[in-house]
Amino acid sequence: MTNIIKSFITRNTYLNKLSPSPYQFNKYYSNSISTPPTHSYEKKQQPIQNVDDKKYILTDRFNRHHTYLRISLTERCNLRCKYCMPEEGVMLSQADKILTTDEIIRLSKLFVSAGVNKIRFTGGEPLVRKDVEPLIEEVGKIKGLQKIGITTNGILLSRKLDRLHKAGVNLLNISLDTLNSDKFTLITRRLGWDRVFQSIDNALKLDNIKVKVNCVIMKGLNDMEICDFVEMTRDKSVEIRFIEYMPFDGNLWSDKKFLSYTDMIKIIHEKYPTFKKYTIEEEEPNNTSKTYHVPGFKGKVGFITSMSEHFCSSCNRLRITADGNLKVCLFGNTEVNLRDRIRDGASDQQLLEIINAAVLKKKASHAGMYEIAQNKNRPMILIGEKSKIQINFKNKSIKQKKEVKNYLLKLINSSFINSNNNNNNNNNNNNNSKLQYIQQRNYSTNKNNQNLENNEFSHITKDGKLPTMVDISDKIITKRTAHAQSILEFPSNVLSQLLNLEKNNDIDNDNNISKNKEIVSKKGPVFATSIVAGTMAVKNTSNLIPFCHPIPIESCKIEITIIDSTSVKVDCIVSMSGKTGVEMEALTGATITSLTIYDMCKALSKDIVIKETKLISKFGGKSSSPQITK
């Protein structure tokens, strides 16, 4: 390893002559968005002369020393958050394309040997990976690694928390965008708010672990809860981090939804006038968050200002995607394939040379937020020899093939590969020779690119005369999930009678009805009976709907919630592994559950209305739509 380090020092001595890039505001910054305050500052990094020699391997052209590595363990997630998951779904990598446990451990050791002292595991949702606990236990044994973090949505955290803590996890970021359980379901398209909040409370009980709650603020959706989150810091030693809404392909980003951190601070100051910023000396080095607090409160409040005031000049982080690509900038379009180099038998020295070459191509800062928002399906570009361009044209339409061809021609002639800068020409050629392949991959499916030739009624023959069942014999088996919902409206006095409120004390101090309380009619328990009926209906959907295939249901979850004194919500989520979707099963379950509620309660009133039944989401198969209704 000593020889490797010396070779990098020799090749990179020119770094001492470079000064850090000046901080520049986004030229696309809109006048309609509040300008960051003039007293903002750049966080200082350790001078390059005082950094240990090995860190030259992970030092870029702007004197930034990368000591923080984020590793994605999986592309999968058990939530479908609107700001993260495109409406039309994502194309997951095949299982054999995902980094194995041994590969992740090897890369972790390699980066730590080159100066990384902090590793954070992300996803997708990292805790859905089956071997996450033993994997982190092995990483925790690496000498020189000081901090291990996890970013999680908290759904599965409570049952894994103790083992992860013992394995060395001392940094925990939990995503929670609302303190309202119904709004949580709206944002994530899934249930589980109570489990997330329980995970936060359980984590705060542990010693030697920092807990942060990440909250993405979207104007008109959860900005009215900002002060409620700040109030959490009164009695909890937690850091609430408000994240500016960032544009990623498919998340319908709009400046109308964007709220800058300066606007958030104004909102907080109205309720907490003493709210103030920590001094530079109190801040952690390379901290991405601008940290504030209310004097006397136990916790902190941070702002991650990636859009309105970026922190690129102090960036010290690198990322490895779940399928093994090194990404030097979150918003960059380029990724370098480490997985294939490992599987081709590359030595540690060869991998370090590739990593160093990629780091040296890191730009001074990412693009402006409007430019980022306009980048659709940003491709993965693995830079290398032109003769090794690899594109899979199988099953692509003629239009797509032309687009890819034009894209590659433009790429090959671009300055990104053939630099005309005489000062750095030798260095660029040296770096490029160490990077392999060029390929294009979409991060998500795109409605504009879908083949429209198959927009036909699948249950009618092409001549339009005879109904028919769809042939699914050639389809592949995938995980299928569908979520349907029904809303029932009751006359104002009916639910009160059924709940028998005065006897059962089901009114809280705010005169709110208990949302998960069972109601009882003369026929018996209404909700329990209706859930049984809905479950039976799900299993018999093919007997009710003529062209539904008989399928083995693996999971059926029906939840009935009292929204207010006149409304009841039915959620039916159905899952299975098969060749066809389960949306009809979910809709049937929600419908029959609602009809049974009506039947159980009709003696009190015939004016109960099944207001609507709709499909909320479906996932799996070619036409995945994590959000159907808006």
Curated annotation (Swiss-Prot):
- Start and end of every Radical SAM core domain? 61-298
Q: Where does S-adenosyl-L-methionine bind?
A: Y83, G124, S175, M246
Q: Which cofactor does it need?
A: [4Fe-4S] cluster
Q: Which reaction does it catalyse?
A: GTP + AH2 + S-adenosyl-L-methionine = (8S)-3',8-cyclo-7,8-dihydroguanosine 5'-triphosphate + 5'-deoxyadenosine + L-methionine + A + H(+); (8S)-3',8-cyclo-7,8-dihydroguanosine 5'-triphosphate = cyclic pyranopterin phosphate + diphosphate
Q: What is its EC number?
A: 4.1.99.22, 4.6.1.17
Detail which positions bind GTP: R70, R120, T151, K212, R317, L318, R319
Q: Region labeled Molybdenum cofactor biosynthesis protein C — which residues?
A: 402-629
Chain positions recorded as [4Fe-4S] cluster 2 binding sites: C312, C315, C329
According to UniProt, this protein's pathway is:
Cofactor biosynthesis; molybdopterin biosynthesis
Q: Which family does it belong to?
A: In the C-terminal section; belongs to the MoaC family. In the N-terminal section; belongs to the radical SAM superfamily. MoaA family.
**What is this protein's function?**
Isoform mocs1a and isoform mocs1b probably form a complex that catalyzes the conversion of 5'-GTP to cyclic pyranopterin monophosphate (cPMP). mocs1a catalyzes the cyclization of GTP to (8S)-3',8-cyclo-7,8-dihydroguanosine 5'-triphosphate and mocs1b catalyzes the subsequent conversion of (8S)-3',8-cyclo-7,8-dihydroguanosine 5'-triphosphate to cPMP.
Q: How does it assemble?
A: Isoform mocs1a and isoform mocs1b probably form a heterooligomer.
- Protein name according to UniProt: Molybdenum cofactor biosynthesis protein 1
Q: Which organism is it from?
A: Dictyostelium discoideum
